[in-house]
Amino acid sequence: AEAGAHVIVMARRKDQLDGVVAAMTDAGHSAEALVGNLADIEATSAAIDAIRPLDVFVNSAGMARHSPATETAADDFDAVMNVNLRGAYFASQAVAKAMIADGRPGSIINISSQMAVVGGVDRAVYCASKHAVEGFTKSMAIELGPHRIRVNTVCPTFIRTPLTEQTFSQPARVKWIEEKIKLGRVGEVEDIMGAVQFLA
């Protein structure tokens, strides 16, 4: 929004969306809310079709359920994969189809994770989902390049968001994380804004 784009924010909870959109419009930016759930593929596809044309799609939806690999429940596995992989894949597909149909160049940016390239204790399912995001992103980049559509990922380390709130409520865990990060601090959303804006 700060770069001058009209931003359409999509999430499941209207109350959260309204707060985000209000913050942007109060700052003089152009934004609107769209209630939806990436896990609902048909509804997401219809929503994307309704807001065409699109120039940039940033997929930042994510879910994490941590457990030892030997204790992962099938329901937890399915829930994480449904959002992080299935939802991301088919939303990217819908956006790509719309861009191709409209004859527009564009950019699809998937927010992945450092966990896409490293492992983590109690994070086997999350890591698997992000490895998969890296895989389909690379393939889509090759396939969609001829249509002038770029497809990339941004792979940050721990970023302070509602998704990581539980982790950061544990001081010992925060200390361990910060010792692993060369900057000596946990990342903030603002730290990845430049990369996203560049790729857009």
Protein language model regions, located:
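Residue(s) in the substrate-gating loop at a strand-loop-helix junction
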Residues: 113
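Substrate-binding pocket helix/loop in short-chain dehydrogenase/reductase
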Residues: 68-69, 76-78, 177
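The beta1-alpha1 cofactor-binding region of Rossmann-like NAD(H)/NADP(H)-dependent oxidoreductases
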Residues: 14-15, 35-46, 74, 191
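Active-site loop immediately N-terminal to the catalytic Tyr-X3-Lys motif
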Residues: 70, 118-124, 146-147, 184
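C-terminal helical subdomain
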Residues: 153, 175-200
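Alpha-helical segment proximal to the catalytic Tyr-Lys
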Residues: 97, 142-146
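Active-site helix of classical SDR
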Residues: 92, 129, 137
